[in-house]
Curated annotation (Swiss-Prot):
Reaction catalyzed: RNA(n) + a ribonucleoside 5'-triphosphate = RNA(n+1) + diphosphate
UniProt keyword Magnesium, yes or no: yes
Subunit annotation: The RNAP catalytic core consists of 2 alpha, 1 beta, 1 beta' and 1 omega subunit. When a sigma factor is associated with the core the holoenzyme is formed, which can initiate transcription.
A GO cellular component annotation in the UniProt record: DNA-directed RNA polymerase complex
Protein encoded by which gene: rpoC
Name of the featured protein: DNA-directed RNA polymerase subunit beta'
Chain sites annotated for binding Zn(2+) 1: C60, C62, C75, C78
EC number(s) stated in the UniProt entry for this protein: 2.7.7.6
Protein role: DNA-dependent RNA polymerase catalyzes the transcription of DNA into RNA using the four ribonucleoside triphosphates as substrates.
EC class (word): transferase
A GO molecular-function descriptor: zinc ion binding
Cofactor binding annotation: Binds 1 Mg(2+) ion per subunit.
Binding site residues for Mg(2+): D450, D452, D454
UniProtKB keywords: DNA-directed RNA polymerase, Magnesium, Metal-binding, Nucleotidyltransferase, Transcription, Transferase, Zinc
């Protein structure tokens, strides 16, 4: 076998008949497979051992030579070479065809490659190939033309007219082969280039396409006649196996049936030719042979597919590659691995953050080789075989060894669906009883796991390098921040939140209020003796906390806090600010002076006037974690997380929080609010009946009335809730539920959606505490079912979006430190009217500046050029009132096949600068795809009042943007910069005419009368600006403006969708995706370069071609940028392996073979496919060259590799 790590690139091409024969180890002559009595392969059949190799290791077919010592001997009785049976997976055979056949991919694909080379229509080709018409090969001196089609009758007439020697016409693949052999590629190319100079329209397009294919043949060295085959390769038998089922029947791969049909028809054709059978019979047999080969290569591509038993179409060679179950996606991009297990997960509240609980039976199986090695090393077993027996017997020694073996040996846990890279993390195993794996409660968020029966898979990293990577890069402690936004992903939830919320609550007049303690210990003692409560407000001497960052003045005073807050602050790092209120001021290190008693001030008087401080909610806990991570990094944060978890669980238990019917309080004002709403509705109905308003307006108003009523009830509810109400506490703390849940429990359910998706006018005025009427219950069921189906559809849509995103960006890797670009991206906050979508702070944090940022008031430098903006400087920029910052961006990066460190900025998952080798493309795709399921699926109607455009939102809008489709509810854009001269309505045609006067010319645009205008008369508008509300088509924007404007527009629009749903994604992820959509240009005028007009080309390749031409003194080519949707962009990649494994496999491979494409293996997918280590992370060439330094002599005795152990086990068992 070839060592995959030795080659740099992989090429594909057309196989010539000689090549096919050179691959083959022998000709398959008979359709037989296996003898049903002896179960041995038949001679000359599809499983022949002489051709494909022995079925048993080191043993010939007849059994004369057995054992490895005869390696390489060819048996003189049966003719089988003694070797490993594995060769039956790699040795090919072939079938010599009695008549040539065409390859269906090249004749039937779109466009038909054969048709383009011969300049014939696919229909004409089909008639020739399937023996319906003759084609003139050589007209001689008759008036016929070469390549002219003749029907049977015409042919006979012409023979009578001109005689049989005057011209030559044939049919079938032979005729096509002769035509293809007669094509003079160089001459055709020259003629076409001449033709291109004059041709226009349809003719030009056809010429460009023909020239493209012909040049591909010239460049690749493929011959056109190789599209017709004289011999067919037979794939190795172990790739099309035949296995015996119980009851003596056989299950076989469909390919064997397809090969059998070919061999049968081929043998029959040979016999007919030998017998000199009549032409029509031979012709029919040749046609059947052609159809059999078509079915073998791509069943169902032409005509009806060949079916097997039960009318199921047979799977041909093409189907073996295509789709999710095909070779690419099923076996090459994702494989099943050994040393793995799967089990139900259970909660492990006592685990440390880096640990997981591993059931003993799983541990014994997963770590078996390590245990065996250790048993032998300690002398507890004499050899590997004995060690194996001990494990099977579960001896006591085994468990002692197991403890030591799993210590310091991380394992990987994965939960499907793995939507982002946090779906696989490393943990240190701890042995637990039972059969369920234990998962740390804080790891649930990243995995999106719960314990209602979820299962997880476990994998053991075997080699030292793999263990080191798992420990240093993948340990759960390194996954505290989400790669999508840089916000903590391991925030406490549910019980942990409610526990800390309860602990930090304040209550007035609790027992022991106003007591003053020296330190925490004294306060705890008082609590244990029942003198104070967690919620009691007390004083404490600041001197008891010397490490906390108080001001000098504060240190001499007494601080007012609660006992619970003292406990809470005790778990924070020693030098972290004392948290007394849930504000960012306090978090940033400053405890407000109002919490300190002035000298001589009485604490009881102070407390009379002091307001109650709200407790710490989920969001604030998250902020604390982020702040600790920023200051103290990984270790301190993971320790803090465990402490928050333990404290939360303890205190939530002590709080005794329960929920009962009593906690759902009735609302006194509800009947009045509902009565008022009914009254308004009847008024509106009256107006409609009198014809004052339209039905649509009535509907809109009724919906509005009920929504207002529901909001009023909701607000009244919030105010009526007692702060100590358990339901309110759950919602307020962020532990579970939100206000709308409680409105439905205690207020009213409100309006429901009908099956059509429209909102029904009948509101549900009851709540769940009162109970619903039968009618209300029935109305509710629509919404409930719709919710379920929407979720299911959304998951599929979102998963497919992620797959396309990953495919388009998988080769984007950080490849260098600095690309040295001189361009940058000007950014400001993204707003929608007065609504803030994404603030400037979020957009500039962790990015490099392209230009120096100055303070607009003082002119001082805030951040110099080419420096990263960190939290402090970002805040300074915002505080100084800077509105626009020019930053380095992926949009303007010059790095090929990736981005540089400076254009990318900070790695969101670590908070540090990104490193060379980081697979930022994949991370970006996951970050955008993972929240896809949280986006809505709805296309909102903005209701006739506001104009009739539909705004697509949620997931469909994201897809629309990334696929650069024509948007729904499109906005017209102006092509000139100038002033809006007039807006005239034309009621007759129901249109508006907008006239814009530019500097050079005046343009008019026609819009429907219902369009809501963004501009009014006298407004100044830049070209590319939208005239009405709606979505701009990026393709138009690119035509009118430039690449950067288009990129910026898509970025803003994608962010708008996600931020509206409350999902924070860093700009850089979207930038990487959008950049991939705009990396191609279409050649307009080739100048003196070799490129063809109209072809798509990578921007980098285009620059290179132009650079070379200019150096040689030629005229450069001109091109215009094109925007491709992500699907198209993924298929247009330079890697044919990546494209073929994505979609349209046959089309991609057909095209790649004709062009003799070379895959440079720069992306991740193509390397995974061929089994090479991926060129990202530690697989980057720079890291692979590092050699370990020898320190002292090391003994390699007694060191086993896993494969050594497996070999030893095999040999022991054979012995």
């Amino acid at each position: 076998m070839v060592d995959v790590n030795k080659f740099e690139s992989m090429q594909i091409g057309l196989a010539s008949p000689d090549k096919i024969r050179s691959w083959s180890y022998g000709e398959v002559k008979k359709p037989e497979t296996i003898n049903y009595r002896t179960l041995k392969p038949e001679k000359d059949g599809l499983f022949d051992e002489r051709i494909f190799g022995p079925t048993k290791d080191w043993e010939c077919a007849c059994g004369k030579y057995k054992r490895i010592r005869y390696k390489g001997v060819v048996c003189d009785r049966c003719g089988v070479e003694v070797t490993r049976s594995k060769v039956r997976r790699e040795r090919m055979g072939h079938i010599e065809l009695a008549a040539p056949v065409t390859h269906i991919w090249y004749f039937k694909g779109i466009p038909s490659r054969m048709g383009l080379v011969l300049d014939m229509s696919p229909r004409a080709l089909e008639e020739i190939i399937y023996f319906a018409s003759y084609v003139v090969l050589d007209p001689g001196n008759t008036p016929l033309e070469k390549k002219q089609l003749l029907s049977e009758r015409d042919y006979r007439d012409k023979l009578l007219e001109y005689g049989s020697d005057a011209f030559k016409a044939e049919m079938g693949a032979e005729a096509i082969k002769k035509l293809l052999m007669s094509v003079d590629l160089d001459k055709e190319v020259t003629e076409l280039k001449e033709e291109l100079k004059e041709a226009t329209g349809q003719k030009r397009t056809r010429a460009v396409r023909r020239l493209d294919i012909l040049e591909a043949f010239v460049m690749s060295g493929n011959r056109p006649e190789w599209m017709v085959m004289d011999a067919i390769p037979v794939i190795p038998p172990d790739l099309r196996p035949m296995v015996q089922l119980e009851g003596g029947r056989f299950a076989t791969s469909d390919l064997n049936d397809l090969y059998r049909r070919v061999i049968n028809r081929n043998s029959r054709l040979k016999r007919l030719l030998d017998l000199n059978a009549p032409g029509i019979i031979v012709q029919n047999e040749k046609r059947m042979l052609q159809e059999a080969v078509d079915a073998l290569i791509d069943n169902g591509r032409r005509g009806r597919p060949v079916a097997g038993p039960g009318n199921r179409p047979l799977k041909s060679l093409s189907h073996m590659l295509k789709g999710k179950q095909g070779r690419f996606r099923q076996n090459l991009l994702g494989k099943r691995v050994d040393y793995s297990g799967r089990s139900v997960i259970d909660v492990g509240p006592s685990l440390k953050f880096n640990q997981m609980g591993l059931p003993v039976p799983m541990a014994l199986e997963l770590f078996r080789p390590f245990i065996m090695k250790e048993l032998v090393a300690r002398g507890l077993a004499s050899n590997i075989k004995n060690a194996k027996r001990q494990i099977d017997r579960e001896d006591d020694d085994v468990f002692n060894v197991l403890e030591d073996v799993i210590k310091e040996h991380p394992v990987l846990l994965n939960r499907a669906p793995t939507l982002h890279r946090l779906g696989i993390q490393a943990f240190e195993p701890v042995l637990v009883s039972g059969k369920a794996m234990r998962l740390h409660p804080l790891a649930c968020e990243a995995y999106n796991a719960d314990f209602d029966g979820d299962q997880m898979a476990i994998h053991v990293p075997l080699s030292d390098e793999a263990q080191a990577e798992a420990r240093l890069l993948m340990l759960a402690a390194h996954h505290i921040l989400a790669p999508a936004s840089g916000k903590p992903v391991v925030a406490p939830s549910q019980d942990m939140v409610i526990g800390n919320y309860y602990l930090t609550m304040e209550e007035a007049n609790r027992e022991g209020e106003g007591m003053i303690f020296t330190d925490l210990d004294e306060a705890t003692l008082a609590y244990r003796n029942g003198i104070v409560h967690w919620h009691t407000r007390v004083g404490v001497q600041v001197t008891s906390m010397p490490d906390k960052p108080f001001t000098d003045e504060q240190r001499s005073k007494i601080m007012v806090t609660t006992v619970g807050k003292l406990i809470f602050n005790n778990i924070l790092p020693k030098s972290f600010p004392y948290l007394n209120e849930p504000t960012s001021t306090n978090l940033n290190g400053y405890v407000p002076d109002k919490y300190f008693l002035e000298p001589g001030e009485d604490i009881h008087d102070y407390l009379q006037n002091a307001e109650i401080i709200p407790p710490f909610k989920k969001g604030f806990l998250s902020d604390i974690i982020a702040a600790v991570y920023q200051q103290y990094k990984v270790t301190a944060t993971s320790e803090l997380l465990d402490r928050i978890k333990d404290l939360g669980y303890n205190e939530s238990t002590k709080s005794g929080l329960t929920v009962g019917m009593v906690d759902v309080t009735d609302l006194k004002e509800k009947p009045e609010i509902i009565a008022a709403a009914h009254k308004q509705v009847s008024t509106v109905t009256k107006q409609f009946r009198r014809g004052l308003i339209t039905d649509h307006e009535r509907y809109e108003r009724v919906i509005g009335i009920w929504n207002d009523a529901k909001d009023e009830i909701q607000n009244a509810l919030i105010h009526s809730f007692d702060q100590q109400n358990p339901i309110f506490m759950m919602s307020d703390s962020g532990a579970r539920g939100n206000i709308s849940n409680f409105t439905q429990l205690a207020g009213m359910r409100g309006l429901m959606a009908a099956p059509s998706g429209d909102i029904m006018e009948l509101p549900i005025t009851s709540n769940f505490r009162e109970g619903l009427t039968v009618m209300e219950m029935f109305i509710s069921t629509h919404g409930a079912r719709k919710g379920m189906t929407d979720t299911a559809l959304k998951t599929a849509n979102s998963g497919y979006l992620t797959r396309r995103l990953v495919d388009v960006a998988q080769d984007v890797i950080i490849r260098e430190k600095d690309c040295g670009t001189d361009r940058g991206l000007k950014i400001r906050a993204i707003t929608d009217g007065n609504e803030m979508i994404e603030p400037l702070y979020d957009r500039i944090l962790g990015r490099y500046t392209q230009k120096t940022v100055y303070d607009p008031q003082t002119g001082d430098v805030i951040v110099p050029k080419n420096q990263m903006i960190v939290e402090d400087t970002a805040q300074q920029i915002v505080d100084a009132g800077v509105e626009e910052v020019t930053i380095r961006s992926a949009f303007t990066c010059n790095t090929e096949h990736g981005v540089c460190e400076h254009c990318y900025g900070r790695n969101m998952a670590t908070g540090d600068e990104v490193e060379v080798g980081e697979a930022v493309g994949t991370v970006a795709a996951q970050s955008i795809g993972e929240p896809g399921t949280q986006l809505t699926m709805r296309n909102f109607h903005t209701g006739g009042v506001a104009g009739n455009e539909d705004i697509t939102q949620g997931l469909p809008r994201v897809q629309e943007l990334f696929e650069s489709r024509n948007p729904k509810g499109k906005a017209e854009i102006t092509e000139v910069t100038g002033t809006v001269e007039s807006i005239e309505e034309n009621p007759a045609e129901r249109t508006k005419e907008i006239t814009i006067k530019g500097e050079a010319d005046t343009r008019s645009y026609t819009l429907p009368i219902t369009a809501r205008m963004r501009v009014s008369e006298g407004d100044f508008i830049h070209r590319g600006g939208a005239l009405n509300y709606g979505s701009v088509d990026p393709k138009e924007l690119l035509r009118v403006r430039d690449v950067l404007s288009t990129e910026t527009y898509i970025l803003g629009e994608v962010q708008r969708v996600y931020r509206m749903q409350g999902v924070a994604i860093s700009d850089k992820h979207v930038e990487i995706m959008v950049r991939q959509m705009l990396r191609k240009v279409r050649i307009m005028d080739p100048g003196d370069t070799d490129v063809l007009p109209g072809t798509l080309m990578d921007i980098q390749d285009f620059r290179r071609a132009n650079y070379q031409t200019l150096i040689d003194g030629g005229i450069a080519a001109t091109a215009r940028p094109v925007i491709l949707g992500i699907t198209k962009a993924a298929l247009e990649t330079n890697s044919f392996l990546s494209a073929a494994s994505f979609q349209e496999t046959t089309r991609v491979l057909t095209d790649a073979a004709i062009r003799g494409k070379n895959d440079p293996l720069v992306g991740l997918k193509e390397n995974v496919i061929i089994g090479k280590i991926i060129p990202a992370g530690t697989g980057m060439p720079d890291y692979r060259q590092i050699k370990p330094k020898e320190v002292g002599g090391t003994s390699t005795e007694g060191v086993y590799s896993i494969s050594d152990l497996e070999k030893q086990m095999q040999e022991d068992s054979q012995a």
